[in-house]
Each structure stands twice: as structure tokens, then as C-alpha cells.
Design a protein with these regions (language model features):
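Conserved acidic carboxylate
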Residues: 19
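Short amphipathic alpha-helix used as the core "switch/output" element in two-component signaling
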Residues: 74-85
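Two-component/phosphorelay signaling modules centered on CheY-like receiver
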Residues: 22-40
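Acidic catalytic/metal-coordinating carboxylates
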Residues: 23, 44, 72-75
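Active-site beta3 strand of CheY-like receiver
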Residues: 57-63
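Non-catalytic signal-transmission and effector/linker regions of two-component phosphorelay proteins
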Residues: 1-16, 120-140
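The feature encodes the CheY-like receiver
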Residues: 69, 97
Length: 140
């Protein structure tokens, strides 16, 4: 099966990516460019927190890097959870330690995914949290 992001009906969905690694940002942009979703990218945790403080539009899903500059991903999740308790957050990281994973879940992330994250997993997460209609092979 060939996965095609344009098969997802994400029009009107707001997806936030908090990531400082340029190749990772390009990867997300490539996967999501034809989805119809509004994708917002923040290169530092501070940019994301400043955005939250403005009380802007709803956020439907957050892809959060663990180690982003200025304010790390764990602290970003804690701050997000003060006002947006139900916004799904997927922590994406290279940190495989149980301590890091536990810390992320305690902060309030919904998923803890190790890099590299493959398109099938991203599609699965989009379907799971945004309730789209794509059929994805569920091997997770």
C-alpha cells in the first residue's frame, strides 16, 4: 500500500511541530504539505510558549522534540497542560532511556516515539489523534 498524505482529510486541523533540527522540519513539511492541515513550526520551546501565551487558535496535535532550545520539550508540555489538558502531544526523541520516557509521560505527553519516525507511524498518529479516514496498516 502506498501511503499518501493527501488521502487524509485534515482541512481545518491545526498541527504544531516544535523542532530545531532542519532535516526533521523538512521531513514533516514534506509529509504534511498536501494534507490540508494548518502546520505551524516552532524552532525553540520559547517560540512555542510565546505562541501559547497569545491565546491563539486551537491546537489539534503537537509533535514535540524532547531537546529543543531555550525551553525543553518536557517544560513545554507542562506549560501547555496548564490550559490545554486534552491537546494530544507526541514526544519524538532520540532518548531511549526509561527515565526520559517516564518524565515525558509525567509531564503529560500522549505518545513517546523514538527517532527515526517513519511515515507509517506519522500516518497512524494522525489517524489516531485527528480521527481521519485513512486506512493505515496497524503494525504498532
Amino acid at each position: 500500500m502506498t501511503l499518501n498524505i493527501s488521502n487524509l482529510e485534515l482541512t481545518g486541523k491545526n498541527i504544531v511541530i516544535v523542532e530545531d533540527d532542519l532535516p526533521s522540519i523538512r521531513y514533516y513539511e514534506t509529509l504534511l504539505k498536501n494534507s490540508g492541515a494548518d502546520v505551524m513550526i516552532f524552532h525553540t520551546g520559547k517560540e512555542f510558549i510565546d505562541y501559547l501565551a497569545q491565546g491563539n487558535k486551537p491546537i489539534d496535535l503537537v509533535f514535540m522534540d524532547f531537546l529543543v532550545p531555550l525551553i525543553n520539550g518536557i517544560e513545554c508540555i507542562r506549560i501547555l497542560r496548564k490550559d490545554r489538558k486534552s491537546t494530544p502531544v507526541v514526544m519524538i526523541t532520540a532518548y531511549s532511556s526509561e527515565q526520559a520516557k517516564t518524565e515525558a509521560y509525567i509531564a503529560g505527553c500522549n505518545e513517546y516515539v523514538l527517532k527515526p519516525i517513519y511515515p507509517e507511524k506519522i500516518f497512524f498518529l494522525l489517524e489516531k489523534y485527528l480521527k481521519s479516514s485513512i486506512s493505515v496498516p496497524h503494525s504498532y
